[in-house]
């Protein structure tokens, strides 16, 4: 069955919003549109279940059940146990909680590997542990391509490395990193692995159980959901790290790294993300676990013409691979004008795009790009239409 873009777009109310008509959305990496099931669940929760969950009366029990439904459904798609899925206010906040746990867990002189390719969320919290005597080793990127070479990691690994942190996919380079290969190398050296999946998850939730990292982080609001950070913490590591929650919650894995009460309504609404992914697969006659492949195939089909058009332009530097199959549809280009300025010009042609450094300051500097100049970032996902791609290409012709 051919990918049904019309059906997909019907699941996102933003496409029927009068104030957005005629505008093509190419800033999905900053936050995707929200699917209807999430909005419906959030609305229902505030209408009929906005009470303390897990209590003795029906509304309270329904509230707790819906929160559990979110965790159970996400765990099914992520290939992990239900209690290995935790929620928090954002990925950055979740990483700071994890960094605090590792600060207590590690000894002075032990090491953490971080990359130049990461968004600051999976970099800054770990680097701050240097203040406590933890050695920070930097896995550098290729200054021309932004590529993160696994062979370079081998040179950084030894018995003192306890944790390796890297992105599944950079939010400016766009290249998809070989998580399974990198994780296996880190594990062989005795290190745990933390993967930032924020820029990858919107293009298909990974089978975390299969690819193997000990921690996998992503953001619901960039994955068609509400503003929540979602983290998978595998059982062996989650039980070994010091509890960061109330002492009486220490025996419940999914509570150990949620220091404060979660946003009940938004956690419950995350079940709508699962509703959508299941419906997407069913509509196309696929198993629910095949939803990710459906999304990915459609994105690759739309992405290659954009990459070709940008690669063939003078005075345009494309960051990351020019092959759609090896990257996410998060496309950053360096121009002779500041990225934000070009994004403003594109808006006059009905294109919603982003310009700036996108909290990837270290990556841009490593590639010789002034963060204040920034990049133009064009990012989309599976619900983007061919018509919108054509609109973008025409706008780029006019502006560049």
Predicted regions and their residues:
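Pyridoxal 5′-phosphate
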Residues: 1-400
């Amino acid at each position: 069955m051919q990918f049904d873009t019309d059906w997909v777009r019907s699941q996102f109310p933003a496409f029927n919003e009068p104030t957005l008509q005629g505008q093509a959305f190419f800033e999905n990496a900053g936050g995707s549109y929200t699917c209807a099931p999430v909005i419906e669940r959030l609305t229902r929760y505030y209408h009929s279940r906005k009470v303390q969950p897990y209590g003795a009366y029906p509304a309270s029990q329904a509230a707790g059940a819906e929160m559990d439904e979110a965790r159970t459904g996400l765990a099914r798609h992520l290939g992990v146990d239900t209690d290995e899925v935790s929620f928090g206010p954002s990925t950055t906040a979740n990483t700071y909680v994890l960094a605090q746990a590792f600060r207590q867990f590690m000894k002075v002189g032990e090491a953490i590997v971080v990359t130049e390719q990461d968004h600051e969320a999976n970099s800054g919290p770990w680097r701050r542990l240097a203040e406590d005597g933890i050695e920070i080793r930097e896995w550098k990127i290729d200054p021309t391509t932004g590529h993160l070479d696994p062979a370079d990691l081998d040179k950084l690994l030894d018995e003192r490395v306890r944790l390796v942190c890297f992105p599944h996919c950079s939010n400016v380079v766009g290249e998809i990193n070989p998580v399974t290969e990198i994780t296996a190398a880190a594990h062989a050296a005795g290190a745990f692995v933390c993967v930032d999946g924020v820029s990858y998850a919107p293009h298909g939730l990974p089978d975390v159980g299969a690819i193997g990292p000990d921690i996998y982080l992503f953001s619901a609001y960039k994955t068609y959901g509400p503003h929540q950070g979602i983290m998978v913490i595998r059982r062996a590591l989650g039980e070994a790290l010091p509890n960061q929650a109330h002492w009486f919650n220490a025996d419940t894995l999914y509570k150990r790294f949620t220091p404060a009460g979660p946003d009940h309504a938004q956690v419950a609404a995350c079940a709508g993300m699962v509703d959508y992914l299941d419906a997407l697969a069913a509509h196309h006659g696929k198993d629910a676990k095949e939803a990710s492949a459906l999304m990915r195939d459609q994105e690759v089909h739309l992405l290659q013409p954009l990459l070709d058009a940008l690669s063939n332009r003078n005075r345009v530097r494309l960051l990351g691979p020019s092959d759609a199959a090896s990257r996410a549809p998060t496309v950053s280009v360096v121009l002779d004008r500041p990225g934000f300025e070009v994004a403003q010009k594109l808006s006059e042609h009905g294109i919603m795009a982003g310009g700036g450094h996108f909290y990837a300051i270290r990556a841009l500097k490593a590639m010789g790009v002034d963060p204040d100049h920034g990049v133009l970032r064009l990012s989309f996902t599976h619900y983007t239409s061919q018509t919108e791609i054509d609109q973008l290409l025409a706008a780029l012709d006019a502006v560049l």
